[in-house]
Amino acid sequence: MSAGEIDRLIGLLARLPGLGPRSARRAALHLLKRRESLMDPLMEALGAVAASVRLCPVCGTLDTRAPCSICADPRRDGTLICVVRDVADLWALERGGVFSGRYHVLGGLLSAIDGVGPEDLGLDRLAARVAEGPVVEVILALPATVEGQTTAHVIADLIEPKGITVSGLAQGVPVGGELDYLDDGTLTAALRARRPV
């Protein structure tokens, strides 16, 4: 392997989230030192994933099946659709094991600055899924950012006229959180979303 190939590997690793040039160099060196036990299996796994993983045509998640294992699971509640920004958010909800409905992955958020409009997020696919039934509630699990809230309002305006309940995740003080350590936005959201005890 020439220095150019090593530099290319480092450059590609540095493009991964959370890895800068120094971390990428350390990762590349680690891989090179453990070629048989780590690099070769990693190359095989990457090749297999590249060849077999695709977007689910129904919800937009990543899976080796089409439709994905979540959409194809008859035990999932088809009356609930949870809308998430990306696959990482879906995985986070699945890790919690609390939601038993189906998902819709937007693949991003509306952003005038970045030129992302409703057509880029497949909102027409979401509207079609809701229209086909038997959906009774759409849960918006979107970030509490300007883009997330803008996206939520657009989706609510699209879905609510169809007589479907549109809800959002609760926001506020996390379990075990101390008020002194929370930012002003979180405290404001918590006060506005207060409920009877």
Curated annotation (Swiss-Prot):
Keyword Transferase: no
Keyword terms of this UniProt record: DNA damage, DNA recombination, DNA repair, Metal-binding, Zinc, Zinc-finger
CDD domains tied to this protein: TOPRIM_recR (cd01025)
Pfam families reported for this sequence: RecR_C, RecR_HhH, RecR_ZnF, Toprim_4
GO molecular-function term, one example from the UniProt record: DNA binding
Residue ranges of every copy of the Toprim domain listed in the record: 79-174
Keyword Zinc: yes
Zinc finger regions, C4-type: 56-71
One GO biological process term: DNA recombination
Gene3D superfamilies (alphabetical): 3.40.1360.10, 6.10.250.240, RecR Domain 1
UniProt function note: May play a role in DNA repair. It seems to be involved in an RecBC-independent recombinational process of DNA repair. It may act with RecF and RecO.
Protein family per UniProt: Belongs to the RecR family.
Designated name of the protein: Recombination protein RecR
Source species: Rhodospirillum rubrum (strain ATCC 11170 / ATH 1.1.1 / DSM 467 / LMG 4362 / NCIMB 8255 / S1)
Gene of this entry: recR
